[in-house]
């Protein structure tokens, strides 16, 4: 069994155990459920900051304990530096293990609050199941990167970009995170090392690592919320945007949706679970180009904006793509659609204005 498969099995078992042992109860009132999800996310973010603080203080404590050695001679100074580096790697590894475990536990508690159906939980062995999507979000893994529905997420990345990506995937998460923090510490030492000891420098760097943990966990929680919300909200958005039924859409509208999703997926470099659910309904893309009229393009753009708002992505490539959609749809209409989706997510307001 490969390490990757072993990690998957551990994550699945951790999620299922947390789900069955959780004291959370399903909350029928969706506004109350949303508040509970907010609390769970906030607590997870706070715990990540505390984990970063404890890890950093442990390293600083070891550095202070070894400080007298550094003044004896060069070999002792080298030994102290090596011990601090090893302590940093071990502490960061334990810290990351705690963060992954805590994310999986939080994912299970969130699923319990929203009362994810048993039939979905029973699909956990399937790669494209709802529990797998939650687990991957909790572990910081991206969505599906293979070709699905005739769309290759990595098609526009280029040969050299693909080579770099393959190289990075071979670097283990724990090792890379430990190395990253070690590099930051070395930079910090170079910057203020002349006016402070190594131990003091590590202590002063503590807020940086706490902030990194908070930012990382906040991103993870947002991704988990997006996938949970998408599970319930996506069918409602589809029904509202296409009251005639997705099977009865015109060829031009289907083609516009496929083209739009292809652009979004290639910009993100992976297929989001919300997109997978929709593409499963749309089926394979028509290889021959289909003429799209103005009304079909407008309906497709409105729907693409809604799904993009649900995913919460906002990097440079997404913003560039969003500007193109806004240009076609208009700033006013784009803002209205986003506000309607935002209200549906956070205030559970029903869709009332026609999108047809």
Task: Specify the residue positions occupied by each region the protein language model found.
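Terminal, membrane-proximal amphipathic helices
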Residues: 1-81, 105-305, 316, 320-324, ...
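Short acidic, glycine/Ser/Thr-rich loop/turn "cap" segments at secondary-structure junctions
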Residues: 84-94, 133, 304-308
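Hydrophobic alpha-helical membrane-embedded segments
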Residues: 87-112
């Amino acid at each position: 069994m490969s390490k990757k498969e072993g990690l998957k099995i551990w994550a699945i078992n951790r999620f299922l155990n947390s789900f069955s042992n959780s004291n959370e109860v399903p909350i029928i009132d969706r506004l109350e459920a949303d508040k509970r999800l907010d609390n769970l996310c906030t607590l997870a973010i706070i715990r990540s900051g505390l984990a970063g603080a404890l890890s950093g203080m442990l390293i600083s404590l070891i550095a202070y304990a070894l400080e007298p050695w550094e003044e004896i001679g060069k070999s002792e100074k080298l030994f102290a530096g090596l011990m601090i580096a090893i302590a940093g790697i071990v502490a960061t590894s334990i810290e990351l293990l705690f963060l992954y475990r805590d994310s999986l536990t939080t994912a299970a508690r969130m699923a319990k609050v929203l009362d994810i159906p048993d039939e979905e939980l029973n699909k956990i062995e399937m790669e494209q199941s709802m529990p797998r999507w939650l687990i991957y979000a909790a572990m910081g893994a991206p969505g599906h990167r293979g070709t699905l529905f005739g769309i290759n997420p990595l098609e526009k990345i280029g040969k050299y970009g693909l080579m770099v990506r393959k190289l990075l995937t071979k670097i283990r998460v724990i090792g890379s995170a430990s190395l990253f923090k070690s590099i930051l510490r070395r930079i910090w030492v170079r910057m203020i090392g002349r006016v402070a000891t190594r131990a003091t420098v590590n202590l002063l760097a503590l807020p940086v690592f706490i902030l990194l943990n908070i930012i990382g966990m906040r991103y993870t929680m947002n991704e988990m919320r997006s996938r949970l919300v998408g599970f319930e909200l996506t069918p409602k958005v589809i029904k509202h945007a296409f009251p005639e039924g997705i099977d009865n859409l015109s060829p031009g509208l289907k083609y516009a949706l496929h083209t739009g999703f292809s652009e979004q997926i290639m910009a993100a470099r992976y297929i989001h679970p919300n997109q997978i659910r929709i593409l499963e309904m749309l089926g394979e893309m028509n290889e021959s180009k289909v003429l799209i009229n103005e009304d079909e393009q407008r309906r497709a753009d409105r729907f693409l904006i809604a799904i993009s708002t649900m995913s919460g992505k906002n990097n440079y490539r997404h913003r560039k793509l969003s500007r193109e959609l806004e240009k076609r749809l208009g700033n006013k209409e784009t803002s209205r659609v986003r506000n309607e989706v935002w209200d549906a997510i956070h205030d559970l307001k029903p869709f009332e204005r026609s999108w047809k």
